[in-house]
């Protein structure tokens, strides 16, 4: 079992390059098979979720050529509407994007119910509602979603709740439906806009992504394209809070500052100095930070994927902070681990009350999910002494070379696999 071992207590200082957005890359890779021509995608993050999805694409007949770690060519001319089995995609929730892509291209999709992080029920009912409205027949049999249609037809769909996944998935299918589809109460996240831009670069006709209403005029075929994925605003935000929690001075490069507005607002609120450039943001924390209140919301509100990172930082702030999690249930599991490090926290339903302490104590903790795992690493970096983070497979799902990037800005962190390596690390840093 791989673990991170961390010697904390020093500020993080320097510059770190942010990679492509995982949450944009996953649906874009799925959508790439909707044309029979070759698609080139670059600025891909080299993370486990991406590699699992590429293997699944290959398994249904797509030709995959890795140009380099961050660039891939995909040709979907050999794609068949074969079943996508649980073993192929059990580790990633984004497997549901195959439904929209295959329904649009092949008029049939059989996909195992998705896996991924355990952070609540995260239903896919809005996806299925959208597909049915477009004319697909949907059955759930033996842990699989079976979707079939003779022809998808454009329609007017109002989502009952704002869902990033449903917005993207239904938009993909509607891109090749007959007629015009209007989607209302849609998600506006940057990766929703990115997948719309990608589909448009292949010849789709999608307007309004990033606004309240998306209008899609279906086309009969899509064509080849070359496309670069947007930077990952969640990876950027993670390093920004790492700077804040460690009283550091970090510049995150290759970002779109507009995508980070909610994160920047909270960093300024708790006392950080934040400077924005064209494609970079600098975060400086010179003194002890102060408490605040935060509520997770759909974009452009504060992102749920940044909730654990601010939670860890607030545990070290002066005063009492309140976090309200309005997107997912079970997203406070990391606070039990943080309490093992001396944090004073109380959870009441979807609200966490955090009493700031002067310092945390090193401990052995376990990552309950992707973002929580990264947040616990931040806690370790902000804490004097040796902290060990178990179950880092979650972190590797969504962060490329996480420990290397932290080391580049002064973090003392290594990946280990045995007690012997742990002892070797302790000797080295003692």
Language-model features: where?
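Short, structured segments at the rim of ligand-binding sites
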Residues: 1-430
